[in-house]
Swiss-Prot record:
Cellular compartment(s): Cytoplasm
Annotated organism of origin: Thermofilum pendens (strain DSM 2475 / Hrk 5)
Alphabetical GO biological process terms: amide biosynthetic process; glutamyl-tRNA aminoacylation
Family in the record: Belongs to the class-I aminoacyl-tRNA synthetase family. Glutamate--tRNA ligase type 2 subfamily.
Protein name according to UniProt: Glutamate--tRNA ligase
MF terms (GO), sorted A to Z: ATP binding; glutamate-tRNA ligase activity
Highest classification ranks of the organism: Archaea, Thermoproteota, Thermoprotei, Thermofilales, Thermofilaceae
A Pfam family matched in the record: tRNA-synt_1c_C2
EC number: 6.1.1.17
Span(s) of short sequence motif 'HIGH' region: 108-118
Length: 569
RNA sequence: GCCCCGGUCGUCUAGCCCGGUCAAGGAUAUCGGCCUCUCGAGCCGAAGAUCCCGGGUUCAAAUCCCGGCCGGGGCACCA
């Protein structure tokens, strides 16, 4: 045994010394020894002493003899390969207990379309339920506020579309405004068991009780009284604001907002009708109540949501406790700030109202529809979300990162086209007989996609203004000498290797007679840049939605005739 | 102010739960080279991290414990 350890120590001491300029470190060698011979941990102190001796010996040797001894005894120790890591999120706690039947949900308020911020919970919840576990993914519309965050009738469908595009199809769908009776029933049970009560104090009075950490006088009334009040709430005898149903928690809870939080309130739906149910209901559950009840009723096992919901989890646990239900596992992830993109719902909405943004898919915005219009692929959003993962700390991700992921997917798909941006130069061609024919490569990585033929008779082309050399290569057409300050191009040959050898700039061009005018729209912070120019004739045939690369310019998505939206470099 | 939660290359992240194969791996951005009919892609290389700071436990701490600092979230009859 002793001998074995000494040998192992010698091996790692040598390897360590060779790796770090002749001096091995005791700590590192000890670690390696334990890794190779885990049993040795039991006699850790002795091993350390032994390693110290060995390291001393090794360090007194010359680097050359260390290396030669190592390669003689353990040649394999010289190759330092590393483990490869697989990109995958950590498993979910509590997934075993449910036998891998993980049920998650995505629960948006249908008051707006989805944006990059909402993509995170959508993808994460979908990923765990459907990709990592063999479970169920639920879509639930949380539209229980007809007053402050009024649902937008179109939003239900817009969100469904957004999710389908994102690649997170759902197994079941629920709309909270259609489930009011469910919430009423649980409310009644809680009142009867003395765990909820109707309070008729004003908002200010309730706040005062909370701040003081004192119980609400209403809470001392018997359940029968509260049942009566509850009936009166439902029958419309209390005007808006006159009564609320509160959940008993702890009047002195360290977090004042948890103290007997409000589960239902009266809303005047004649004044502010709900887009789906009109004025049918006047008593509305709050987010925390509806959410708690639904998560249980729908069998949700895991809730993944942002850290802004941390206190809500705390509140909702009281409903579970009172009802004797088992709460789902909650995981809170941190904020994801996307630098250089407008994400906030309220800012977007205000911007659209003020005319700052044209619409919900204005290319400067971070809505999923805007990203799609810009040519961002859902796969790229997935990569971004999965990379950021479920860490609780705030992540400041850059648009560059999103673009890098997107480029990975877009690059092979996007065929190459030529587009000459303004200011373009017109040059006449000498030395080629009309009709002139060029063959441009459709995609350099995929020769099987072939070449595109451009034929024209009038010997004039548009050139990008950055052509300043005495010779230039026009892609697919030939090498030229630049004469008369760039107004003339004299044909030399069509040999790519000539261009390489003489280091000619290789540029895009467009025939003047059949070029297609176009403009590229580019989101630049709060502005939209417009780059107009001339494209090769086949641009006219590209269908809207097609994503291509404008050579030497960047990737674009075809918006419509003559309009292209810049995706990224 | 009160209540939570965090802190690893510029940025994002792996490792942390269960201390040792980590003098810290990957990605992105940057810089160089090769390759390419693009300023795209690919390949190779460089540089980049006092693992927030201080203390403690231990043979051994990015990992466990305590304190500090800094950052974030919440404090609605919104979701």
């Amino acid at each position: 045994m002793e001998v074995d350890i000494r040998r192992v120590a010698l091996k790692h001491a040598l390897a360590n010394a060779v790796k770090f300029g002749g001096k091995a470190r005791v700590d590192s060698v000890v670690s390696k020894v334990f890794a190779e011979v885990p049993e040795a941990r039991k006699a850790a102190k002795e091993v350390v002493e032994l390693v110290k001796e060995v390291v001393e010996e090794v360090n007194s040797m010359s680097p050359e003899s260390q290396a030669s001894l190592l390669s003689e005894l353990w040649p394999e120790a010289l190759s330092g390969e590393r483990k490869v890591e697989v990109k995958r999120l950590p498993p979910l706690p509590g997934a075993e207990e449910v036998g891998g039947k993980v049920v998650t949900r995505f629960a948006p308020n249908p008051d707006f379309v989805l944006h990059l911020g909402s993509a995170r919970p959508a993808i994460l919840n979908y990923y765990y339920a459907k990709k990592m576990y063999n479970g169920k993914f639920i879509l639930r519309f949380e539209d229980t506020d007809p007053r402050t965050k009024r649902p937008m009738p179109e939003a239900y469908d817009l969100i469904r579309e957004d999710l389908r595009w994102l690649g997170t199809p759902w197994d079941e769908e629920y709309i909270q405004s259609q489930r009011m009776e469910v919430y009423y029933e649980v409310a009644e049970a809680l009142i009867k068991s003395g765990n909820a009560y109707v309070c008729t104090h004003s908002q200010d009075e309730i706040k005062a009780f909370r701040d003081a950490g004192k119980p609400d006088p209403c809470s001392f009334l018997p359940p029968e009284e509260h049942m009566e009040r509850w009936e009166k709430m439902l029958s419309g005898e209390y005007p808006e604001g006159a009564a609320v149903l509160r959940i008993k928690t702890d009047p002195a809870h360290p977090n004042p907002s948890v103290r007997d939080w409000i589960a239902f309130r009266v809303l005047d739906t004649e004044k502010t009708p709900h887009p789906l149910t009109g004025d049918k209901y006047r008593v509305w559950p709050t987010y925390n109540f509806a959410c708690a009840v639904d998560d249980h009723m729908l069998g949700v096992t895991h809730v993944l949501r942002g850290e802004e919901h941390a206190v809500n989890t705390l509140k909702q646990e009281y409903v579970y406790r009172h009802m004797g239900w088992k709460p789902p596992v909650s995981i809170h992830f941190g904020r994801m700030n996307l630098e250089g993109m407008v994400l906030s719902k309220s800012v977007i909405r205000r911007g659209i109202e003020k005319g700052l943004f044209s619409s919900i898919d204005d290319i400067r915005l971070g809505t999923l529809r805007a990203l799609r219009r810009r040519g961002i692929l859902p796969e790229a959003i997935w990569d971004l979300v999965l990379e950021v993962g479920i860490k609780p700390s705030t992540a400041r991700v850059s648009v560059d990162k999103l673009h890098a992921f997107n480029r990975k997917y877009l690059e092979p798909r996007a065929n190459r086209y030529m587009f000459v941006p303004e200011p373009a130069k017109v040059a006449s061609i000498e030395g080629l007989e009309a009709p002139i024919t060029a063959e441009v490569i459709v995609h350099p990585s995929f020769p099987e996609r072939g070449r595109r033929r451009i034929t024209f008779s009038k010997p004039e082309v548009y050139l990008p203004s950055d052509v300043a050399s005495s010779m230039v290569r026009l892609m697919g057409l030939g090498n030229f000498e630049v004469v008369d300050g760039g107004s003339k191009l004299r044909y030399l040959n069509n040999d790519v290797s000539f261009a390489k050898k003489h280091e000619l700039p290789i540029v895009q061009w467009a025939p003047v007679e059949s070029s297609v005018r176009g403009r590229v729209l580019k989101a630049a912070g709060t502005k939209i840049e417009e780059i107009s120019g001339y494209g090769e004739p086949s641009l006219a045939e590209l269908p809207p939605g097609e994503q291509v690369q404008f050579v030497r310019l960047g990737f674009v998505r075809v918006e419509g005739p003559e309009t292209y939206i810049f995706t990224h470099d």
